Amino acid sequence: MQAYEQIRMMKEEKFKYQKQIDMLLALGCQLPELFAPNDMNACRFAFSGADYQNHIPQYLSNPKRMLQDINNGKGNTSLLALSCFSTTEKAELFYLNLRKAFKNIASTIGDSLSEGKLSNEDGRKTKTASNGHFDFYEYEACDLNKTFQITKNLIEKKDEKD
């Protein structure tokens, strides 16, 4: 009965960026297999002191990228989801590697780590990769600014060797 309820609920819910997802689906893109998060703890990168910039998918923070990807036949629904991590350790390691490759990463994806809980009413997630990363597709009513809190500044680390 519980599985039936989840399927019924998922069919009734609309994703926050459903219009854009539908457009990509019409162009032949596909949604990945999605799962209920079941109140899992998660973390993601965020901007300290700029809540309005947090929890915005890549295609919405850079609409030109979406148009370019579509024009080049490289549209991807994943870029309408939020990148999340299953543990702070895996998120910090991922960020450290990004900082080594991209010196301005803090201004692109954030300077801090935010943590919160993802409920089944918030949306659906992809399978968690071995590096802890997964995509989270928010439902319309989801507002992670209310449930996620910044827990750590990531740019104060003194582990870079320039």
Stretches found by the model and what they are:
Residues 62, 78-83, 120-122, 149-158:
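Low-complexity, flexible helical/coil segments
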Residues 61, 96, 100-103, 156, ...:
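Generic surface-pattern signal
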Residues 1-76, 162:
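ADP-ribose/NAD+-binding catalytic cleft of ART/PARP-like enzymes
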Residues 27-30, 34-37, 116, 121, ...:
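Low-complexity, intrinsically disordered/propeptide-like segments
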Residues 69-141:
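ADP-ribosyltransferase catalytic core
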Residues 136-162:
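Charged phosphate-binding loop/patch that engages nucleotide di/tri-phosphates or the phosphate backbone
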Residues 48-59, 120-127, 145:
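Short, surface-exposed beta-strand/loop "edge" segments at domain boundaries and coil↔beta transitions
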Residues 53, 60, 67, 93, ...:
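Amphipathic alpha-helical interaction segments
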